[in-house]
Amino acid sequence: MSERVHRNSAYLNGKSTTGTITRVKDTSPTSGMCPICIRDCPIMCEISLSSFRGREALYPEPVQFGYSTAGALKDFGLDWSHFNIQAGLFEALGIEENSDVAIFPNVSTETKVGGIPIKVPILTGAFGSTDVARLNWEGLAIGAALSGAIVIVGENVCGMDPEAQFTNGKVTYSKELKRRVDLFRKFWDGKYGDIAVQTNVEDQRLGVDVYALSKLEVNIIERKWGQGAKAIGGEVRVRDLDRAIMLKKRGYIVIPDPEDPTVQQAFKEGVFKSFERHSRVGIPKEKNMVEDIEWLRKQGAKHVTLKTGAYRPSAVAYTMKIASEAKINALYFDGAGGGTGMSPVPMMDEMSIPTVYLEAIVLKCAQILKKKGRYVPDLIMAGGFINETQIFKAIAMSNFGDGPFVKAVLMGRSPITAVMKASYFKQLAEEGKLPKTFADRFGSTPEKFFIAAPELKEKYGERFKEIPWEGVALYTYLTDRLGVGLKQLLAGNRKWKLELINRNDLMSLSDIAAKVTGIPLPHEVEKDAIERILD
């Protein structure tokens, strides 16, 4: 059973994200240190690790880079568990009031994001140049295509591609980006979902947007202003000296300097085992952004989206203003607590606005824009989403009566978990090393333990052999779990169409939730209705 993080500073000196622990469990609630810190202690706490490895201690365990994702450990005091969903009884909205018809399989979870239809209100990504995205891309792309979802290729893919070709500083070919687009389209039905290419400052300098639009015929370009896990540029680890030098020559910030002879010697001697590659941070301006969006559309972008992080409220308002002026199709806000391939752990825990707080601020801005008759782009929330209850709550909270502002959620870590777990268990099955309890419950071959396999075999016939088990896993997670789970919640709420759920379908379970969102506590809900009904 997992241990819940204390709502004080007791967790500061021992975090699973950095692989650190303390000698005793009853640590100081002020500092996280052991009440008695002794000399003869072999345990590696945060202070200890920092004294040996310095900046490495800022990040999730370096040895796990490429084979893991990370998220915040801190309890922010308000999350989606602070709300419950109202159950209905006397009506059936969005469907015929017939008990033979109003059953949960008939619920529609379809929606549109920026004009793009999707089967479930989920986008996956953004999966950029970090190794965990590259290594798991086949399952991520094909699984999203099978699910009718949108998948987003993240930042720096072309810049990190050793086989990329450039002319006058602009990319003219990228084997890796082409691979990513082609894998999605292999099983894309051409109707539901799509693939987007995200671009940051480095990507724009390299002309990744033009290449993706003109050569790969991508329909969606996403500009990136930030993410919830960090408020600085994208980061990856590079374990090869020659590659680190290549990236520096391509204009990236590489730390330490791979061309420094002293650094090279230390690397060869094993003093450190990886370099850090960092991206620059953009400083957006309203006029430049509006012109940029117009330029992208002239280049052939059918849909333009913007992803930003969990910046201060005034920055949220300014972002909403610019997105409105530029008529951006969809705008993503990524709350603190979300996932990463590599972000500073202290920044994940201690910086930026947590998701529920952030959505409340975003919705305030959306209401102001709408009241003024201004354009409001479709909104997507991100930051720690893993199941259908959170999705329901995020969408319902955004509907003040004229339809939800939030059309879908963006999920990053959980799709990777689904794909990684499938890859690992496929390997264990091939080696005959599956855990006995798992094999006894679900079977010893992928054909048996992936419950959606028969359905996909029936649908795709001979082509099923081309679907990796990792793709089957993501489809199962997004469609058979989240999709069906969402249908059940909607039916229990007595609404058979996603756009019908609203704020009245939620209740706050804590004073802070009620104060932040304006959603009342259970005993305060529908008080007037009670009086009226019993009159």
Where on the chain are the PLM-derived regions?
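Flexible, glycine/charged-enriched surface loops at secondary-structure junctions
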Residues: G154, H303-K307, K372-R374, N493-R503
